[in-house]
Amino acid sequence: MSRLKRIAGQDPRAGFKEGGRDCGTSVPQGLLKAARKSGQLNLSGRNLSEVPQCVWRINVDIPEEANQNLSFGATERWWEQTDLTKLIISNNKLQSLTDDLRLLPALTVLDIHDNQLTSLPSAIRELQNLQKLNVSHNKLKILPEEITNLRNLKCLYLQHNELTCISEGFEQFSNLEDLDLSNNRLTTVPASFSSLSSLVRLNLSSNELKSLPAEINRMKRLKHLDCNSNLLETIPPELAGMESLELLYLRRNKLRFLPEFPSCSLLKELHVGENQIEMLEAEHLKHLNSILVLDLRDNKLKSVPDEIILLQSLERLDLSNNDISSLPYSLGNLHLKFLALEGNPLRTIRREIINKGTQEVLKYLRSKIKDDGPSQSESATETAMTLPSESRVNIRAIITLKILDYSDKQATLIPDEVFDAVKSNIITSINFSKNQLCEIPKRMVELKEMVSDVNLSFNKLSFISLELCVLQKLTFLDLRNNFLNSLPEEVESLVRLQTINLSFNRFKMLPEVLYRIFTLETILISNNQVGSVDPQKMKMMENLTTLDLQNNDLLQIPPELGNCVNLRTLLLDGNPFRVPRAAILMKGTAGILEYLRDRIPT
């Protein structure tokens, strides 16, 4: 019998009434018998117009087979049945559900998609264990207020209904991770959605939305946002602060401008095709460090900026059906797997080259650089210089982008000619990543009055020399994927440093010197061997908002870390500690910090 607390109003003798009634041939007794053992019942695609009573009362009535054998020594002990936890009644012809739904309080999964439901019973509020509810592909026009009582719900699928508004109290779904409201008739999204702090995936596509609430940026764990096929004309600038966002879909809207994404460093896919975007500028691109897919098809773009070369991770670029007449030759230096150019009035690339596919187009663009051909946007300005080593330094990047780029050359040292190429130009960024460097190039000191960004990732550095420590204007330092296990005390002189990336090195502790750099806002030190952090010193770092300690050797998390209230992103997954439990980590940074504070000894 059901081991859950008896439902209010239920007959206490119900478990000893004869069962099997009102089932007919629609639900075979063998299926019910198996469900009492497994706790799962699948009645999809049975042409049901209503749910038989024997289903609602599966854990209430005596099963029919018990009438044949009432012996306590029987092999089949019906009284030891399992509570029904999963019920699938999808792909039927149900027009309503009765309040008998409350007779299944142990349900964790209820799947009733693809029916003809116009409403849900108020008794749904009693399914307090429900974690997944699928009511998609029905005819719901409104949701009952009682649905907000389902506080343990993690997945809610409401797509393909006729909803015109969101129920009040929706923000009470504090554990909700996956919400699909696509293909409805929604015109607004309430600001209270921002309280869905656990949400990872939100699908609002194919509605009638004209705007998104600015408060959406409070969804600190959101990774997937789909707003395709709406009426959006602008995107709130606050969206640019969503640091966890990885996939953003804005296709088929009315956007005229591409938003900037200064904080979306994890964004992997940006889909803004089929809008009315007229301009693509450097400001739109320079922060998209992780972008893999960029969809700009069917817009009104007239040009592609030279800064497209900044998207070094880009694999797929769709520029089809725009008004682009020429491409920057630097595009050929990207490692694209797919480039779509159809439907543009290109004058500088022959159709036969485009028809040969992506790699031939890239090869052609690279050949124009090698020929020192003029850029389409300027006259005969030199774009590259060949060094004695036969490698090339991008002069155009130096002049226009203020970047000294000698990356991905597998070089063991940086040739003097690279630094000589700077001449009197202002350089703000250095990129020597993806080489074989064992030490910091000594001539970097020549740029100490200019450089703010340095990327030395993916090298073989085992120590940091003083040449780096004199770059007093440095704000961003990328040292990931090296062999470092310590930082020199002189790093403290980097008084403007805001972001440091030490991931994939050999640190066994958070370098002490970092605690004394009070300008730091972001510390990334995942995938090392860090065994401890000092919460008292970290509390003094009032500007620190992001701390990534994933995949280290932390055996415990000090409760005092909860006092670091300025942290907006704290990542702890992949460590061997037992507390906080995974369920606490799933609540996000605010939940973790609150949990830790509650454990501080008084």
UniProtKB/Swiss-Prot annotation:
Stored InterPro entries: Leu-rich_rpt, Leu-rich_rpt_typical-subtyp, LRR_dom_sf, LRR_domain-containing
LRR repeat windows: 83-104, 106-127, 129-150, 152-173, 175-196, 198-219, 221-242, 244-265, 266-286, 290-311, 313-335, 336-356, 400-421, 426-447, 450-472, 473-494, 496-517, 519-540, 543-564, 566-586
Keywords: Leucine-rich repeat, Phosphoprotein, Repeat
Any GO CC annotation of this UniProt entry: cytoplasm
SMART domains per record: LRR_BAC (SM00364), LRR_SD22 (SM00365), LRR_TYP (SM00369)
Keyword Repeat included in the entry's annotation: yes
Region annotation Disordered: where it falls in the sequence: 1-22
Signal sequence annotation: none
Disulfide links within the chain: none
Modified residues (Phosphoserine): 71
Pfam families: LRR_1, LRR_8
Statement: the UniProt record of this protein carries the keyword Repeat: yes
Classification via PANTHER family: PTHR48051, RAS SUPPRESSOR PROTEIN 1 (PTHR48051:SF1)
UniProt-recorded name of the protein: Leucine-rich repeat-containing protein 40
Designated gene of the protein: LRRC40
